[in-house]
């Protein structure tokens, strides 16, 4: 049986050495290991937790290490991060287990010289009451450390929205995100789906104010449950659902979803259309088109044509559409609670986004029929991902 802590440390090292997506890496590793369901749940919580709180954890390591952070063994750093996270944020883990298992990881990863260092730092942190000292930090730096958010992003939030809103946003950026799903109205109703989920011991409730939306509580490996496999729902954030409702497609229309993968928005659009009409779901990467096709098949949706297409370049083979959804590539800073690695990008990583977004918007506008509708959406809190010049649509 695989060791969940060792699995997590190896995944974290992979994240540090590549540009892997946390969710895809986790799915890949879990599919190839023999972890029990309980160990998978623990490993997922620890993995995402360390990514989310990395800046805070590194601050603690730096404050308690006589060795400069940059000179520490990378494996020892990951072990310390996981150990400290368990001590601070996982009440179910005994302190002794957090320490002892961390020391064992040093042996398993052959960083023998770090055993005493790891053991000493974790035990010293416990003796100190597991307190984090913010003494002497400037307000922006303290917020950055407390909520594990890069200083440049903290300062930008304060500058654009004020301190009160920035603090609320930072608080909302950490912690376990809720899981929402869209009821597949082609197959069932909200009431019937909730009853079916209850039979499988999955707690869920209707989300107030948004028809056919439910909130799942502790869903676990939701893709393995029978209602999911039967295509009774698909997982989709509220913001994504609202994009589709704003577009307001109806039966027998022609609709384009120009940046569609993995397909959640297209599925909701198809359901709103009653599975009648034409819906073109496109993505730049051919391998992601398969995700759309698989999801549509599971949900019983037949009106979707999934295809590879570069949304920034006009495709004369596409039809004129009644409605176009333009959910452009963006910084993703509005969803960092789900993808915590995003906030550790540098500002320069987003430099090319506005131009790409403008090209996609300008191209998408050319597909809209006279009197048609185009909805443009982006998942960003700060002014990185917005077109910087006006677009005139005739």
Q: Model segments located where?
A:
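Hydrophobic alpha-helical segments, chiefly the membrane-spanning helices
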Residues: 393-394
């Amino acid at each position: 049986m695989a060791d969940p802590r060792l699995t997590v440390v190896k995944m974290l090292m992979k994240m540090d050495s590549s540009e892997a997506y946390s969710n895809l890496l986790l799915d890949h590793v879990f599919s190839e290991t023999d972890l029990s369901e309980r160990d998978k749940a623990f490993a997922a919580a620890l993995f995402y937790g360390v990514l989310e709180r990395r800046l805070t954890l590194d601050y603690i390591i730096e404050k308690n290490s006589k060795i400069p952070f940059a000179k520490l063994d990378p494996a020892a750093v990951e072990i310390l991060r996981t150990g400290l996270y368990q001590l601070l944020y996982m009440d179910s883990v005994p302190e002794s287990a957090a320490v002892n298992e961390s020391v064992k990881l040093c042996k398993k990863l052959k960083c023998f010289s770090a055993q005493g260092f790891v053991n000493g730092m974790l035990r010293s942190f416990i003796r100190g009451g597991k307190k984090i000292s913010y003494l002497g930090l400037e307000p922006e730096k303290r917020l950055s450390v407390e909520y594990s958010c890069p200083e440049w992003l903290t300062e930008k939030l304060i500058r654009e929205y004020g301190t009160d809103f920035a603090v609320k946003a930072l608080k909302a950026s950490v912690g376990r995100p809720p899981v929402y799903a869209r009821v597949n109205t082609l197959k069932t109703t909200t009431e019937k789906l909730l009853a079916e989920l209850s039979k499988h011991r999955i707690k869920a409730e209707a989300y107030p104010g948004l028809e056919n939306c439910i909130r799942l509580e502790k869903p676990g490996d939701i893709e393995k449950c029978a209602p999911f496999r039967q295509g009774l729902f698909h997982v989709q954030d509220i913001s994504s659902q609202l994009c589709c409702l704003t577009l307001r497609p109806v039966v027998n229309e022609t609709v384009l979803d120009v940046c569609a993968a993995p397909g959640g928005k297209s599925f909701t659009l198809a359901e709103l259309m009653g599975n009648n009409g034409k819906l073109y779901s496109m993505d730049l990467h051919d391998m992601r088109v398969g995700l759309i096709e698989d999801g549509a098949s599971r949900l019983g949706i037949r009106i979707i044509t999934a295809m590879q297409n570069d949304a920034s370049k006009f495709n004369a083979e596409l039809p004129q559409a009644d409605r176009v959804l333009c959910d452009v590539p963006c910084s993703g800073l509005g969803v960092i609670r789900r993808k915590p690695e995003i906030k550790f990008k540098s500002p320069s990583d987003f430099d090319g986004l506005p131009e790409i977004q403008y090209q996609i918007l300008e191209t998408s506008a050319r597909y809209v029929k006279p009197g048609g509708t185009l909805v443009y959406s982006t998942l960003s809190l700060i002014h990185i991902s917005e077109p910087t010049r006006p677009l005139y649509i005739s």
